[in-house]
Amino acid sequence: MRKGVHPKNNLVVFKDGSNGAMFLTRSTLNSKETIKYTDGKEYPLITVEITSRSHPFYTGQQKFVDAAGRIDKFNKRYKKS
């Protein structure tokens, strides 16, 4: 592999802005802001708006839209006679 072509991959902490959950993972992102993680080491901190810990799809708290009512209304309106 050529040197200097690939981005630097390092450990960073991603923090969910809505509920405070934190994940330690590898990323090419970097930040000047740091945080001390549960293992006692300091890592760059990336704050994100939403993660799998707070997204309604993954938490099971999603709301289903009444699509059936809309489909029936559409079919009634544009039904071929």
Swiss-Prot record:
Coiled-coil residues: none
GO MF annotation terms? structural constituent of ribosome
Q: Which residues cross the membrane?
A: none
Q: Which InterPro entries match?
A: Ribosomal_bL28/bL31-like_sf, Ribosomal_bL31, Ribosomal_bL31_B, Ribosomal_bL31_sf
Question: What Pfam families does its record include?
Answer: Ribosomal_L31 (PF01197)
Q: Listed GO cellular component terms? A: ribonucleoprotein complex; ribosome
UniProt keyword annotations, A-Z? Ribonucleoprotein, Ribosomal protein
GO biological process terms, semicolon-separated: translation
* Protein family membership: Belongs to the bacterial ribosomal protein bL31 family. Type B subfamily.
Output the NCBIfam families linked to this UniProt entry.
Answer: L31, PRK01678.1
Self-association and partners: Part of the 50S ribosomal subunit.
For this entry, the protein name equals Large ribosomal subunit protein bL31B
Q: What's the source species for this entry?
A: Borrelia garinii subsp. bavariensis (strain ATCC BAA-2496 / DSM 23469 / PBi) (Borreliella bavariensis)
Q: What is the lineage of its organism?
A: Bacteria, Pseudomonadati, Spirochaetota, Spirochaetia, Spirochaetales
